[in-house]
Amino acid sequence: MKKTSSRYLAGSLAAHGSILVFALMGLEVIIMISPFAFFFYSVFSPIFNFLNHYPATAWLTTFFLPHMILPPTLGLRVIRIAGSVLFLAGALTFLICALQVYLGKIFKWGLARHGLYRFIRHPQYLALAMWGIGMAILWPRFIVLVFLSIMFVLYYYLSRDEERRMLARYPESYSAYMASTGMFFPRIKAQRSAVQPGHLLSSPWRHAVIPILTVAVVLSTGFLLREVTLKSLPFETEGNLSMISILPEDNPLVGTIVQAIAANKTDTTLAFLKSEKDYLGYVMPPDYVMQGMIANTGSDFHLFKQHNTVAMISDWVLHPFEHLRRSPAAHMAKMHNVEPTVARRHHCPLGKNDASLDCSICPYRRVILVEVDGNGGQRLTGSATLSISAPRIPVGFVDINAATGEIIESQRVGTATAWAGIPTPAI
């Protein structure tokens, strides 16, 4: 009995430890826009930088779904909405089930057989899985998927061990309960089908096959989603310049913008563009909220300094697309009870605080340009500029009138983003 208890304790610690690490990796997005970003990255930046430094591990820090680009297709938008739904539903379900179990222990209600426990034996673990999948969609780094798959495996074995202990303690009642419920999903068949000899679950190889298969399926899904994402992005290319818009409504403007910049790249104001290098340009509103993840364009876009973390996180979860269209001034306006349109004009990065201007139809756009290293002189265009193996270094930004092609201002930037050397999203 002691051996069984020790084994369960070890399994429980491993499983809960995995979800703690997963939560830290997944909730990085919350921490990175909070005043605690410095403390978090003082611990984890060496890990991220180490992984990002080697081609064999650089994929772990990259993203498999759009995070700062508004999803361009219906399928990707549905996935993004599902992320918010699963994140919230999983968290709420877990809290309800946890209350049911722990109140049952306090008041000695016996086995939990009501609510979701009437249909499945481990709704808490199912809820954690839902929350985890939602978190992985909301903050889609590959390293989050790795820990998510490990969490799946550990909680599967922890569930089986819990069932063995319950059968030993309540052989008749728990056996009947198992016959009428599913492990993680409601049972469809009335009779519990026995595992046949030779089946994977009865094979001695199962302890190796199940973890490997789980990790492989989860990561393969991530790579598939990344490929679908890259193929859905509408690039415009002119010479060594490839461009993409952050917002889909700006897609018609990209062709004019890339041609205007290509025609002026020999100008001294665009001296940061070299003919022998390849560049990826992100087209966005001048006050686009997440531009600090691409380049350090000024303290207004250092989100960890804005002191409105809760509002931004709520917006990110509850408004999957509109949060990308809101400027940093919008949240500050709400905090100080100021008209958002007035605040947006007042904080316009181009200094165009004109009451007659309507920011919603503003013709000006900012283009942040990053240099893409082709590794060995290979020229990269289109989706190849987002290759996992291609380093991307910020070089400058251009403010342009998208209607006329007139360049208003250009500025060189440092080689780091607003988060210094931390690998940030490229999509």
For the regions a protein language model found, what residue spans apply to each?
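Membrane-anchoring alpha-helices and their flanking helix-loop junctions
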Residues: 1-113, 131-426
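Conserved SAM-binding loop
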Residues: 119-126
